Structure formats: C-alpha cells, structure tokens
Amino acid sequence: MGVTELGKLIPDNLRRRVSLEQLNGKLIALDAYNALYQFLASIRQPDGTPLMDSQGRVTSHLSGLLYRTINLLEYGIKPVYVFDGKPPELKLIEIEKRRRVREKAVEDWIKAVEEGKKSEARKYAQRALFITSDMVDEAKRLLDSMGVPWVQAPSEGEAQAAYMASKGIVWAAGSQDYDSFLFGAPRLVRNLTISGRRKLPGRDEYVEVTPELIELNDVLKALRLRDRGQLIDLAILLGTDYNPEGIPGIGPQRALRLIQEYGSLDKLMNTVLKNAQFPVDPFKIREFFLNPPVTQEVNVKFKEPNEDEVVRLLVEEHDFSQDRVKNALERLRKSMGKAKGSTTLDSFFG
C-alpha cells in the first residue's frame, strides 16, 4: 500500500528525525496490517518459512506483535493498532493483481526450496505474504490479553488512523505510507521500529533507519499547495492504491508543476489531460480520500494485562517458550507504567 511517488516530493528537511524517547507519552495509531506484514516478512527461517507451532500454524505475527508492542511501551509510547475493514470497490482491481503476484511467488518459492536455493526461496517467500482471518483474530486476542487497545476500521485502516489523529484522539498516525496525509492525518510518524533497522522489501538486506516525524501543513507549504484537496489531486496523477499506474509519462516534478499551475485535477482534465485515460474515475478516488468510512466513537483506553490469557494463547496453544513468555510479561508489567511524568499504571489506564 502507499503512494511512494508522493514521498519523493517531500523535502528531507521536513523529515524531522526523532528518538523513541521523544515520543514518550504519545498515543499513536498504528497500521495493524502493515505491522503484521512486517513481522511475517522478517521473522522467518533461512529458507523463508515463517515460524510455526507443532501443528504447522504460523506464529511469526504473534511473536512480532508481542515484542514490538512491549518495546514501544518500554519507551512510554502508547500504540493503538488499527485493523483494515472491507476494502473499497475502488481497490478491487489492485487486490486481484496482488493476489496473482502472491500466487506466482508461492510457485517460485516452492521451486527454490526444492532446488535448495535458500536466498531465492526467502525472497519469493516474502513476496508470497498473506494475512489470514485467523491471524487477524489471534492478533486482536493477543492485544486484548495484553491490555493494548485496537480499533476495527469499517474500511481502510489508514483512513481510520488519520481520522483519529485529526480529531486529537491520538497524537499521530504511525505508518510507512503517505496515504495518511491524503486521508487527513495532521502528523505522521514513519520508521517506528525499535531495532534501528528495516528490511528492504523483497530483499534479504537491511538499512539503518530512525523514526521521522512529518507534518501535513509543512508538506503543503513546502509544495506550495493550497490544501489537502490539491495534495490528493497530485497523488492521483502519480498513482495511489486505487489507480497504481497514475498517468503514464507524468513524474513527480511535472505533476507538482501541473497542480501548481492549473490548481485542480478538474481543470487539468479539461485542458492538458483531456485525452488522458483513467481506468478508475479520479473523482471517486478524490471523494474517497476526502470522506472515507470511519468509526467516530472509538475506545483507546489501556487495561491491565491478563497474563493467564497471554500464556494460554502463546504457550498452551502455540508452543511458545514458557520462560520467554514469562520474561516478556515481566517487561510488559513494568512498561505499562512508563508514561511521561508518572510511574503508575494510571498513566496508561486513565
């Protein structure tokens, strides 16, 4: 997911490097599916096979969710995971395309494993990622037992996270994708990892990263755009999840100049782009970004962990090491009190 071309237009000086310590006490809405995909991609065996329990059920997502969440809490960061709901019809073509890519990757992965090509097998395995409904249910169950809030979006999770940030329910949206700005998030935190490095998509390589904070108003000012509507029109020219190809032949700089000069996609389509082909109605895309389905009433309150339930899910049902889970629970217990200016659980549960 994401509008990567748009990111190329955001100046480096707007990407404020922040430490995890500086995010102490901040409530941040995290893209749950983005996080789960990250765990499935990175927590794997040498041949690309994910971690599994004795019954062959994937557990990489649970391991990643447990330890990443605890790491964030230890820095006093309050994560609220937002799960995708029903995808919009605008996205169905792209979803089908991704499904075919995954199916081909599965075939290539199996072949590479059979031929003993571990590096290739791992590469294809990462492309073959998919999240099942069982994985999502288990992730929600783990968060519930840890006392960490999550929100079910009616449609796009990033739209829900952006809404929560725009209303002050959370301090920022946390995602790798710039879609958050198109949906109206005033503040975006990227690279919210603990290890200090991030895996390159489809490659067995890592790059050093630090969290970065970007503000929507700064982006609009730097790009000399009037409002979010113009930013959305710019993104549509470059390509979004709903029209991934954008307009052929129009790169980031030209797209920006066109929006600055003509002011809107409407005027462009009546002039220089009157012969352009749009597989998906661009005005429907714009309307979806401006008014996506969201849940207005959400509960982001933290609760006391149910340690017995964590043990039941991870140790008894999925064969996690009891000692490791016990150690993780001790860290969870201590980290729940780490909020700015307080060492009590009230700082999280209030």
From Swiss-Prot:
Chain residues that bind Mg(2+) 2: D177, D179, D241
Region span, N-domain: 1-102
Region (I-domain) location: 120-263
Cofactor stoichiometry and binding remark: Binds 2 magnesium ions per subunit. They probably participate in the reaction catalyzed by the enzyme. May bind an additional third magnesium ion after substrate binding.
EC number in record: 3.1.-.-
GO biological process, one term: DNA replication, removal of RNA primer
Domain of life from the UniProt record: Archaea
UniProt keyword annotation of Nucleotide-binding present: no
Cofactor: Mg(2+)
PROSITE patterns: XPG_1
Record keyword Magnesium present: yes
A GO term, aspect molecular function: magnesium ion binding
Binding-site list for Mg(2+) 1: D31, D84, E156, E158
Keyword terms, alphabetized: DNA damage, DNA repair, DNA replication, Endonuclease, Exonuclease, Hydrolase, Magnesium, Metal-binding, Nuclease
Record HAMAP family: Fen (MF_00614)
Task of the protein: Structure-specific nuclease with 5'-flap endonuclease and 5'-3' exonuclease activities involved in DNA replication and repair. During DNA replication, cleaves the 5'-overhanging flap structure that is generated by displacement synthesis when DNA polymerase encounters the 5'-end of a downstream Okazaki fragment. Binds the unpaired 3'-DNA end and kinks the DNA to facilitate 5' cleavage specificity. Cleaves one nucleotide into the double-stranded DNA from the junction in flap DNA, leaving a nick for ligation. Also involved in the base excision repair (BER) pathway.
Stated family: Belongs to the XPG/RAD2 endonuclease family. FEN1 subfamily.
Subunit note: Interacts with PCNA. PCNA stimulates the nuclease activity without altering cleavage specificity.
Protein name, per record: Flap endonuclease 1
Organism: Caldivirga maquilingensis (strain ATCC 700844 / DSM 13496 / JCM 10307 / IC-167)
